[in-house]
Amino acid sequence: MGYSSFLEIVKGRFYADTISRFDQADISHLFVDNSRIPASLTKKLKGVDLIISFVSDKGQIMVSNLRAAGVKHVIHYEPFPSEGEAIHVIDHFLRCLDLLGVPYSNKIPKIFLKDEDIVFAENFLNDRVDDPKKMLVTVHPGSGNRQKCWPIDRYVELILWLSEKINAHVLIISGPADRENIEELKVKVKNSFILVDQLPLPIVAAIIKQCNLFVGNDSGITHLAAAVGTPAISMFGPTDPSVWGPRGERVKIFYRKSPCSPCSFDMRKNCFSNICLEGVTVEDIISEIRYIKQYNL
């Protein structure tokens, strides 16, 4: 259960048989203390043996309501590690398996795509790529938080280098929070990229999987790139990559720790200098791309 636009990446793709929207009206009753749970919701929940929740619920109101509604077992963790806790977010999520005694050996996320996802991606690229022999590079210049974004002028310089110096096809991924950055890129790099605009996550993942390289910020799309196995370069600044960094065998993270980094959400919200990300240069990224090309990684 969650937001359907996110959960599509697992529905019928190995991890989930069915999904349920979190933004249904009756769900809101779970967050009200001593709530009278609607019969429609109680009917759904009574047949559930176990719920593992990563919803913020510090007062345990939701947990209490779930148990009152008939759920046999509820395991709850806050959605993120406590601030200052030295644990990667993936290891935080895996705590529930430790509690249940479920063994696991691999801590690297992997996305499984449907054949139809791959076919859509192939058709998308065939319609837009004039030379399939050229290097395909996906770039995501956005993030859910502007302070986590590498400066847009550096993306401009990188995109122009990719298209003009190594003759690569550049695909720019645009999501709901990226409109401002995309409009600026359209002005500054003109027709030097192919826009991947507002597509469902399984399709975005399939397109990235077809590419030779991904470059992006600390964002969910970067984790997606790592999970499909595409070589990924990511720029971190205000957040700690040892906690939030994408995991993968082909991931390179650039992080230039500054005196104020990593910082709290409140500090980040009021920061307009982003000196932590200023320390990552275009030449850093170009050097890594040259290395990847040289060794065909």
Regions picked out by a protein language model, each given a short descriptive name:
Residues 1-297:
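Catalytic machinery of carbohydrate-active enzymes
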